[in-house]
């Protein structure tokens, strides 16, 4: 859900949307090139990009993950965001009951792909891919069964698109 915040146009507040967080450790020019490519592919409704200390990046989502929430999650790796995968998400995403629940895609590429597949403690292959996280987050325990069903429904729908190596959960 887009927040009811001053930087979001009023007609788009509290409507489904997406956010893209781009993290890079290369040069400012490399980062700008990635942002330019993303902006041209999917023009943003709201755009904010700024260098920040890594610790600030880590704290950026703390408020949305406060202590006391009830959560259930599943995940997998997918190699591409195919039309079938997107259709599965579009069909099931509106079925969530909690506005806090989310589906995240982390692009794993670049330095992630450099070590040999058995060279680190992080399991799974090292080929470029997306780590996919389906997270049901509820402020009250009575909401959790419905969110658990939502998470499981999406995980089951994404299974045909998942890689065959070790799943995240």
Task: Locate each region found by the language model.
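Soluble FAD-dependent oxygen oxidases
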Residues: 1-169
């Amino acid at each position: 859900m887009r927040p009811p915040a001053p930087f979001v146009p009023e007609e788009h507040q509290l409507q489904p949307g997406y956010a893209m967080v781009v993290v890079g450790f290369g040069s400012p020019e490399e980062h700008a090139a990635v942002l330019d490519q993303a902006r041209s592919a999917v023009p943003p409704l709201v755009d904010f990009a700024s260098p920040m200390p890594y610790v600030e990046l880590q704290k950026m989502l703390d408020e949305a993950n406060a202590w006391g929430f009830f959560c259930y999650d599943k995940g997998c790796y997918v190699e591409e965001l195919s039309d079938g995968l997107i259709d599965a998400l579009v069909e099931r995403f509106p079925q969530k009951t909690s506005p806090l629940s989310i589906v995240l895609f982390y692009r794993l590429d670049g330095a992630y792909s450099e070590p040999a597949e058995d060279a680190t403690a992080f399991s799974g292959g090292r080929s470029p891919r997306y780590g996919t996280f389906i997270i049901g987050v509820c402020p009250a325990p009575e909401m959790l069964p419905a969110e658990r069903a939502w998470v499981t429904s999406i995980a089951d729908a994404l299974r045909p698109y998942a890689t065959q190596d070790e799943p995240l959960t």
